[in-house]
Amino acid sequence: MRLKQLIEQPCGLKFMLDNLDVHSGYSRRMLLDTEMPKDILSIENNYEILKEFYDVVKEQKNQSQINSLQFKLCNLKEIQGTINHLKNKYVLDDIELFEVKHLAMLSIDIQQIMNKLQLNDMIFIPNLEEVVSILDPDGMKIATFYIYDSYSGKLSELRRKMKVKEDFDEALFNEASGIEDEIRAKLSMQLSKYADELEAAQKSLAFIDLNLAKAYQTIKYNLCFPNIADDGVTEYEGMFHPEVKDALEQKDRAFQPVDIAFWNKPTLITGANMGGKTVVL
C-alpha cells in the first residue's frame, strides 16, 4: 500500500504531510507514492537515517550548511521524462540537455554539502561529474546549456562567418544547424549510459529533502524515535493527535497527552462521552 492511499485516514497523517516543509514538489510526490514499509529492517533503517539528520539539524553550528542545502533543494525538478528519453536512446533537445546538466551540477553541489555535514554515508548520491564534463566542455560551471563552439571547430567557424554577414545566409545557417543536430545526437548517446545514475541521483536528492523536512518536524512537535517491540506489547507514551493539538493551541488550550499499552488481544477503551476516545483511536 502506498502512502497516498492512507492520507485520508482520520489520524492526523494528512495534517502532518501538509505541514512537512519540503523544498521540492517532486519530493512530495515521491513521498506520496512511497510504498509503506512492512518489515522491521526497513522501518529501522528509515529511522536510523532520520536520526542522523535530526542530530545534524539540532546543532546550531550546522545551520549555515543546512541553509545552503535547503536553498539547493529548492532547485530540484523532476526530469523523469528526459531520463526515459535517454534510456530509450532518443536524441535530446537543448532544454532536455539543460535539464540533465542542471541535475548533475545540483547533485554534485548537494553531495559536497552532505560531506561537510557528515551525512554522505546515509544517502548515496551517484557521481555525475562525467555528465557535467560532457555538457560543460569549457568548464564554466554555469547551469545553462547551448551547443558550444568547443564541440566543433567547423561549427565555430560557421558561426563566425554568420556574425560578420550583413544579411541572413540561409546556406550557412542550414549547415550550422546540421552540425548542431549531429552534436545533440552524439551528446545524447554519450549521456544514455548515465540514465540510471541520473534517475538514482534525482531520487536521492528528494530523499534528502524529505529527511531534512522530517527532522525539522520531529523537533517542532517534540516527536520521538520509537523502539519496535517484539514482546507482543504495543505501548505509547505522551501520544497526541497533531491536528487536534494544533487547533487547541490556537485557542490557548492544551492537549492532554495519552499513555496507552495493549497486547495482541482485543482491547476495550472506556470513558465518558466527548472524553477523547475517538481521538486516541
Language model: regions and residue ranges:
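Glycine- and acidic
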Residues: 62, 187-192, 267-271
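Walker A/P-loop
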Residues: 278-279
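Basic/polar, acidic-poor N-terminal "presequence/leader" segments
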Residues: 1-17, 192, 199, 203-206, ...
